[in-house]
Amino acid sequence: MPRCPAGAMDEGPVDLRTRPKGTPGAALPLRKRPLRPASPEPATTRSPAGPLDALRSGCDVPVVPGPPHCVARPEALYYQGPLMPIYSTPTMAPHFPLLNLPTHPYSMICPMEHPLSADIAMATRVDEDGDTPLHIAVVQNNIAAVYRILSLFKLGSREVDVHNNLRQTPLHLAVITTLPDMVRLLVTAGASPMALDRHGQTAIHLACEHRSPSCLQALLDSATSGSVDLEVRNYEGLTALHVAVNTGCQEAVLLLLERGADIDAVDIKSGRSPLIHAVENNSLNMVQLLLLHGANVNAQMYSGSSALHSASGRGLLPLVRTLVRSGADSGLKNCHNDTPLMVARSRRVIDILRGKASRAASGSQPEPSPDQSATNSPESSSRLSSNGLQSSPSSSPSLSPPKDAPGFPATPQNFFLPTTSTPAFLPFPGVLRGPGRPVPPSPAPGSS
């Protein structure tokens, strides 16, 4: 009875009748197959006449001994079949034909992988997050490792803009971590400043979002001419200038304007200009900076509203005053036929839009009303004092009306009669006595 081969009991129940014959590990890939152990040399040396003597009967050609069997050779890593003599050059081949020898389907000597190819494969290998060694070296600010990996990328003709699972390139990570030297190195090596992340933002958007004017300067200086487009919108419809205005980074705004960014560019969703974004963020310094560089103060969004509409509706008094002084049109109508004066809710904003508060802010006194000028004249004050009336409410502080709040028009002064004195009639008929009704003329003496 044939014995069970060694190791068969460890492989589980199998049908020995249908099991193919083969060496252990034959089902594994070539690179994972175990190496063949070298067997010891036989005790008896082989005679010069080998197994080919039967093929060479009657041949006078001397026998060329081949290499011994079971010698460790490179092909042993890939081929598990029987070993045969190898003739590397034609001069070492025998002078007789080798008959009845099977031809191997592939070469027995496989070329070994070059160490440089292994380094390139290791440099471009990704982990479970999609990060390559270049991503990790950039985040760790390892300049030497980045130089080495970039040289391997160049030798292997690989792209520097490799995206991880978050659609971030090594350049994006360098900008996020605020590494201007790393940004300059990557852009010089061929990284594109226009590569988009998962939010549609370029490296320029990210530099403005993270308030990094140094990285923005490195991007704009290292990029080749024509490779940077400052009017690219992200998935929110914002340009890099919109992002810089929203984050309040004035240095980034100045850099973008110096490089030719459109100061009146509108976002795609609402049509707001950078000036309207600055007004809605209540950023007075940013509004003044944009107006100083020529922003259109009357630019309208898709709804027809301007920056003055936004400032008036929100009651932003300093911004309303700045926009009005810069030439904003207070009569401009939006799609609902509303002017900034109509959407304003604050009385002080209304006064600024009507032009009244501008004179009060300059230090000039408001013009007196006709009734107040008549009552404040010396002639009227003498007549009032002769009839027992108070010439001014300042003589009785307890009865004086409260003062007006700053910015509101002054209320006309009223004259009050003393509560203890008897009301005296004025010498001429029809004269007003304070806020009351006109006094009827007194009847003439002797009249019925």
From Swiss-Prot:
Modified residues (Phosphoserine): S39, S369, S396, S400
Entries under InterPro entries matching the protein: Ankyrin_rpt, Ankyrin_rpt-contain_sf, NF-kappa-B_inhibitor
Composition bias type Polar residues, residue spans: 361-376, 411-423
Record's compositionally biased regions (Low complexity): 377-398, 425-436
Record Gene3D superfamilies: Ankyrin repeat-containing domain
UniProt subcellular location: Nucleus; Cytoplasm; Cytoplasm, Perinuclear region
Subunit structure: Component of a complex consisting of the NF-kappa-B p52-p52 homodimer and BCL3. Component of a complex consisting of the NF-kappa-B p50-p50 homodimer and BCL3. Interacts with N4BP2, COPS5 and PIR. Interacts with CYLD.
The protein's name: B-cell lymphoma 3 protein homolog
Organism listed in the record: Mus musculus
